[in-house]
Design a protein with these regions (language model features):
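Alpha-helical, coiled-coil/dimerization segments enriched in small aliphatic residues
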Residues: 2-5, 20, 133-163
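Conserved acidic residues
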Residues: 33, 173-176
Length: 208
């Protein structure tokens, strides 16, 4: 759900029909000045190479946190991304203020984590339906966010389109459930608990 302060502006944007990535023809037809996307958007199977758009006079920006290289952190990817957006759109002061607010929130979380005196093992899980799952490894920014909150990823590499038997091979203290449908947190928890493949996982039984 979009923050209330931005909901009206977001609702006014034209939304293309494609659920994930529009076609190249759709993008070109919109005559954009700038494309901002994830790294996998600019592949031969999706929108094509960024330089094809630059040659057309269209700027292209790849969100740093989506470049699967190393172990991305908020400090190395998210904060610079916000700074770049501030520079591109001429709102550097607002971008700096927003980043400072995020840093304060992260610091507060890290302080609570330290005061708790305990860390948890976590699985970062996404369900695709038809008994297929993905587990996120350290190449995703969510790994750093979880670590800052006191949860250590039990998975050391990305696992895509795997069956439940692979998921059940792990026993995390908690499950961080990635739900792309943008549903409320409680609805996502209900969905996870209702998955018949995962009923025997301790984290699911204990609603964690």
């Amino acid at each position: 759900t979009e923050p209330p302060a931005y909901a009206e502006a977001y609702a006014a944007l034209p939304i293309l029909a494609a659920p994930y990535v529009p076609s190249r023809e759709e993008v070109v037809a919109l005559r954009p000045d700038l494309l901002i996307g994830w790294s996998h958007h600019f592949t031969p199977e999706a929108l094509g190479d960024v330089y094809a758009y630059i040659d057309r006079g269209v700027g292209a920006y790849i969100v740093p946190a989506t470049v699967r290289r190393g172990h991305p952190t908020l400090e190395e990817t998210v904060y610079p991304f916000i700074a770049d957006m501030g520079h591109i759109f001429g709102v550097e002061d607002r971008a700096t203020a927003y980043t400072n607010g995020l840093k304060e929130r992260v610091a507060a979380v890290e302080m609570r984590t330290q005061a708790r005196g305990r860390r948890y093992t976590a699985m970062i899980l996404q369900a695709h339906g038809n008994s297929l799952y993905s587990m996120y490894g350290p190449a995703y920014i969510i790994d750093d966010i979880a670590r800052k909150a006191g949860a250590d990823n039990i998975v050391d590499r990305q696992m895509r389109a795997i069956g439940p038997e692979r998921v059940l091979g792990f026993a995390p203290d908690v499950i961080i459930y990635v739900n792309p449908k943008n549903v409320p947190p409680e609805e996502a928890r209900v969905e996870l608990r209702a998955d018949p493949n995962l009923q025997h996982m301790k984290a699911v039984r204990e609603n964690r």
